[in-house]
From Swiss-Prot:
GO terms for molecular function: DNA-binding transcription factor activity; transcription cis-regulatory region binding. Keywords: DNA-binding, Repressor, Transcription, Transcription regulation. It comes from Shigella flexneri. The keyword Transcription regulation applies. This is Sucrose operon repressor. Repressor for the csc operon. Binds D-fructose as an inducer.
Length: 331
């Protein structure tokens, strides 16, 4: 990583002049300022804000930095952040968070984060995603939480969506359900492939024919949850459902399904069973009857990612965290 001295050398000025430019001192000549700014850009120099804190405090506590892509600004994965903060505090580490507001914003957020010279970095996302890691973060002490990247050297902690859907399908088969209607998440969602593969493998392993399964993918975007109502209505013949269990891509889809089924006088689970996925915080038990669903282990993902940094774990690999099946009253 480039230093203040490197910038001064490339610009042909003193370190004091570089410092004055960075603090927007008016006494620096425009031509000199331009050379310094060009050198900063060429070297991708990031000022060491932690050094200022060290000089002020006399010591440097261990610090864990979190890059949050939609994790802090939506309610669906906030347990990841809470677990990271709690784990860091438990082991005497400081932690701070910087939001990433879009894919294009990641480089800016990374520069801002590196200015604080953290001892470790956790990159988090809302929903399992494939990310492109900003170049400035390569070589840093970093771990991924709820996301993966191309580089196999990057350790990551993600939900075991495949096994979760496999085991939940076994539960449905054991309960006697044979006519599933599946509303999966959009095909573009990384978790969708794992979940559908898990379902289909369990179905085949039970000696069943996939041709008897009705499978659909939701469109991308929250606006399309209402589309599920018309899709569901299309599977009623003479007022009767042509399926005996509805497998939903998440609990929000299950919520829409409940409204349609109950409005038609369909009893859950006596006439049709419903299975969700996510165990959306504070919602599962509010379904009537309570929804059988699968827990996304966001709290464990956050804790394991933090411990990876704190304990100095070595090796880059994908660690899949089990997703427990929560059997309630809808199956």
């Amino acid at each position: 990583m480039a230093s203040l001295k490197d910038v001064a050398r490339l610009a042909g000025v003193s370190m004091m002049t570089v410092s004055r430019v960075m603090h927007n001192a008016e006494s620096v000549r425009p031509a000199t300022r331009d050379r310094v700014l060009q050198a900063i850009q060429t070297l991708n120099y990031v000022p060491d804000l932690s050094a200022r804190k060290m000089r002020a405090q006399g010591r440097k506590p261990s610090t864990l930095a979190v890059l949050a892509q939609d994790t802090a600004t939506t309610p669906f994965s906030v347990d990841i952040l809470l677990a990271i903060e709690q784990t860091a505090s438990e082991f005497g580490w400081n932690s701070f968070l910087i939001n990433i507001f879009s894919e294009d914003d990641a480089a800016r957020a990374a520069r801002q984060l590196l200015a604080h010279r953290p001892d470790g970095i956790i990159y988090t996302t809302m929903g399992l995603r494939h990310i492109t890691l900003p170049e400035s973060l390569y070589g840093e002490n970093i771990v991924l939480a709820n996301c993966v990247a191309d580089d196999p050297a990057l350790p990551s902690y993600i939900p075991d969506d495949y096994t979760a859907q496999y085991e939940s399908t076994q539960h449905l088969l054991a309960a006697g359900y044979r006519q599933p209607l599946c509303f999966w998440l959009p095909e573009s969602a990384l978790a969708t492939g794992y979940r559908r593969q898990g379902f289909e493998q369990a179905w085949r392993d039970a000696g069943r024919d996939l041709a008897e399964v009705k499978q659909f993918h939701m469109a991308t975007g929250d606006d399309h949850y209402t589309d599920l109502a018309s899709l569901l209505n299309a599977h009623f013949k003479s007022g009767k459902p042509d399926f005996d269990v509805l497998i939903c891509g998440n609990d929000r889809a299950a919520f829409v399904a409940y409204q349609v089924l109950l409005a038609k006088g369909v009893r859950i689970p006596q006439d049709v069973a419903v299975m969700g996925f996510d165990n959306l915080v504070g919602v599962g038990h509010l379904f009537l009857p309570p929804l059988t669903t699968i827990q996304l282990p966001h709290d464990i993902i956050g804790r394991e990612a933090a411990l990876h940094i704190i304990e100095g774990r070595e090796g880059g690999r994908v660690t899949r965290i089990p997703c427990p099946l929560l059997i309630r009253c809808s199956t």
